[in-house]
Amino acid sequence: GTGAITEMIIPNLRPDAKFIAMEINADFVKVLRERFPSITVHEDSAANTPKYLKQLGAEHCDSIVSGLPWAFFSEGLQDALLDGAVDALRPGGMFATYTYITSYPMPSSVKFRNRLRARFSEVGVTHVIWANVPPAMVIWARK
């Protein structure tokens, strides 16, 4: 995307934190690099996050925050992306994404949450954030 989530994360990072962003769309990569010159943005699939962690000298990361539209992805793409996330996260690491209340009951969204449960030790959903338009919830998972 264009950095709405990134904009919220950066001010809350620890001083010693390393932050990388993954974006597959070249136009969005350009926007992100212009908006956030202090971070590293890779033009690649999030499924390849482990490769970029290794380039940083890190085997794993503490957390992954995703703004991907999971309910609209094929099962194969969901699997590839989630497998990359699991490989990238340290034991106990956290994965977080969001869903809109309108897509939460969709069969593909239900299947996505089942995929999370199959890969993570703990999965949960926050309360509905009614101030968001459209209302949304955060789905989180602990490795």
Q: Predicted segments — roles?
A:
Residues 25-26, 45:
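Conserved SAM/SAH-binding beta-strand->alpha-helix loop
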Residues 38-51:
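Conserved SAM-binding strand-loop segment of SAM-dependent methyltransferases
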Residues 107-143:
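Class I S-adenosyl-L-methionine
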Residues 52-63:
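A short acidic, Gly/Pro-enriched loop at the edge of an enzyme's catalytic core
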Residues 32-33:
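Conserved SAM-binding loop
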Residues 2-15:
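Conserved SAM-binding loop of SAM-dependent methyltransferases across substrates and taxa
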Residues 79-91:
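A short glycine-rich, Lys/Arg-flanked "PGG" loop and its adjoining helix->strand segment in the class I
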Residues 89-99:
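Conserved beta-strand signature within the Rossmann-like core of class I S-adenosyl-L-methionine
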